[in-house]
Amino acid sequence: MSHFRVMIWLTLFCVGFGYCASAQSLSYNPPPEKTKVQSTGVWFGLYTKYHFNDKWAYYGEYHIRRRNGFKDMAQLYLRFGVTYTLAKYADLTVGIVNPYYWAPDQDDPNLDNVVPQFRTWEQLVFATPFDHIKLYHQLRFEQRYKRGYEKGSSFKLTHRFRYKITLYVPLNKPAFENHTLFLSFYQEIFIQAGESVIYNHLEDSRTYAGLGYNLSEQLQVQAGYMYSFRHFGAPHVYEHRSIFRLSLYHHLDFHLDKHREKRDIPIH
């Protein structure tokens, strides 16, 4: 009798184990293969910094960004801020941002063609002093109220942290002054957080190389190539962007004190 019970239990165990194994094999889905998406764009930017005295300045950025080369409108950025000079090599800025995003599919009736965002932001820029080259560090925090392109979608709060390190190397002069041609490099990392952020905490990585020229003490132009790497709509999809950037930097100082200390923080 005991042998009979043992046989029954072994049979039930084998049947149950086989059922579980079969169910697991049927429910298992292999992870999707990594997908790479290539895109191109052209970004234009105007950066302004207007000093009212030794400590306070207005800061502004105005960007027009196009996708698919130059073909389609992508974004319009309007960034405003107030800058306080902490020291010769350090600036603190706070302000607001009002960007607008154009939907990639402008013909989809279920999507809004243009969607706004609302942000507040804080930034610390400081320089590492060297004799000839210039090295800058930028720490930027953003609180973003953003929504999708779907009609009627609600705004959600996310947070973003950005760190950028920038290097300027003069080419035709020993130091930076009027009519200096220089190399410009930077690397910037974007990290985001929030309830709606699930897999793409590392939002973007941007690498830039270009040339710049100091037209005068108040005006500078830069042009170069930027490579961007980021998630694109799904955990296994990655977008590689090749972007041409053309930027104009305008600086004015309304403070008339001729004995003020020379500032070493550029427009960023």
Residues covered by each model-derived region:
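Transmembrane beta-strands of outer-membrane beta-barrel proteins
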Residues: 58-60, 92-94, 135-139, 161, ...
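Residues on the lipid-exposed face of transmembrane beta-strands in outer-membrane beta-barrel proteins
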Residues: 46-50, 80-84, 122-128, 163-171, ...
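Residues that define the transmembrane beta-barrel architecture of outer-membrane proteins
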Residues: 38-42, 74-76, 116-120, 155-163, ...
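Transmembrane beta-strands of outer-membrane beta-barrel pores
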Residues: 62-68, 96-102, 128-130, 141-145, ...
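Solvent-exposed loop/turn segments connecting transmembrane beta-strands
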Residues: 33-41, 66-75, 195-202, 233-240
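Outer-membrane beta-barrel "beta-signal"
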Residues: 124, 240-268
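Outer-membrane beta-barrel transmembrane domain signature
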Residues: 140-222, 228-229
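Short loop/turn motifs that connect adjacent beta-strands in outer-membrane beta-barrel proteins
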Residues: 54-55, 89, 129-135, 171-181, ...
